[in-house]
Each structure stands twice: as C-alpha cells, then as structure tokens.
A protein has these predicted regions:
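Short S/T/G/P-rich N-terminal loop/turn motif that feeds into the first structured element of a domain
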Residues: 1-53, 60-70, 93-101
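C-terminal structural segments of small proteins and small subunits
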Residues: 66, 73-91
C-alpha cells in the first residue's frame, strides 16, 4: 500500500506563537502515524515560488494523511497556526511502482 504525505510550505509571522502549534500538533500526528521526513532545514529553490519553512510528513497510508487533516483534533490545533502563518499544504499519495533503472 502506498504511503500518504503532507507537503507543507509555510511563512511564519510570529515564531513564538507558532511554537504552540508545533507542540500541540504532536498528539494528532502521532495518532495517525505521522513521521517527519523534512522539518525546516536548508533548501534551495531553483524554480517557482517558495516559503521560508518546508516540511514533508509521511503517513502509513494516503487515507491516514487525509483522516489526520480532517480530524477534529487536528482542526482544533490548526487554529493555533492559521493566525500566525501563511501556508500551502497538499496531501498526496506516494508512488509504489517501478523506478527507473
């Protein structure tokens, strides 16, 4: 079964208040089996637009990624992030097919 991912790009207006979100999101993320593959860190943006912070979060399945986003628990936590940041987030299914040789 293919995994699911959140790909997130964020500009943070208030880093101190944003910390409350990063602390609070741990519980719903753990509940749905989330694992951070990328959490901030250095990046290069050779094409298109970007934001100042990036994250890639892996879930055991696409459905788990969707369910986490729509859960009442995460939606409550999201209220901490929205006033202090601007984000782009997509939920995407991973690829399990053949790879180039």
């Amino acid at each position: 079964m293919a995994k699911g991912y959140w790909i997130v790009r964020v500009d943070i207006a208030d880093p101190e208040r944003y910390k409350a979100y990063t602390t609070a999101n741990a519980r719903p993320m753990a509940r749905y089996g989330a694992r951070f593959l990328v959490r901030a860190g250095k990046f290069e943006n050779p094409e298109g637009g970007s934001r100042t912070r990036n994250a890639v979060i892996e879930f055991p399945s696409y459905q788990a990624a969707v369910d986490c986003w729509h859960s009442a628990e995460y939606q409550e936590v999201l209220k901490l992030r929205v006033p202090v940041s601007t984000a782009d987030l997509i939920i995407i299914e991973g690829y399990d097919g053949p790879q180039p040789a």
